[in-house]
Amino acid sequence: QVGSSAASDVYKRQDISFDKFLNMFDAVFLGMGTYTYMKGGFPGENLDCVYDSLPYLNSNIRNLMQKKDNEYINLKDKTVIVLGGGDTAMDCNRTALRQGAKKVYCAYRRNESNMPGSKREVKNSKEEGIEFLWNMQPVEIIGDQKATAVKFMKTKLKKTDIRGREIPVIVPNSEKIIKCDSVILAFGFRPNPQSWFKENKIFTDEIGRVKINNISKYAHQTNNPKIFSGGDMVRGSDLVVTAVFEGRNAAKGIIDYINDKNK
């Protein structure tokens, strides 16, 4: 109604560089999200029956559509261990239960009060039968070719980090092995800075999040005046509603920028 148009698969074309793309418009908004999986960095993550959270959830959604998904990950009658403590981990917990998993554990290296997932999601997961393993640090996924168990070490919490969260410290000689059929890695996601960021004056912080020019009068403007950004690639993994809110604010910033430029 307001004259917007959408073009998919444009960025996959090799004949359009970002420089050329940028020169085609008065301003560009980057909302590329955080889609790089965070790994645990321990042995066994590449075994069969170990799944990253997003492909697992996506395969389940696609399988509910009219055409069944050839890559559908079905955990019916399986004993599942979900590693992680955010909302994505909660989604994996409850999806596995709805698929008919025999047992679902959710292991997190801190205690419940330090869990990043929403309290409501944790409460709902408990009510549906998820067994939480608090203060448990995974150190190895065990198996020959496929996952058969996860080795954990107990943790205790010490001083807080820069974000105010207590730091888990492994308790010596506290090893525990829990058998399973499948493991889901739900450690969260991180940004994936592109090679063309630097040459276009798009600066990032130490973990790859795009930096916004906080002294600019235009909301969500980067150090390149034509480029705006928001959502997960600026603040880190968060909720869809937060990204939508920042997108709206950035749109207002872009309108103000273009109007001032054309005066």
Residue spans for each PLM region:
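Conserved beta-strand-loop-beta-strand element in the redox core of flavoprotein oxidoreductases
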Residues: R13-F25, D144-E175
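Active-site-proximal substrate-binding core of FAD-dependent oxidoreductases
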Residues: M115, I255-K263
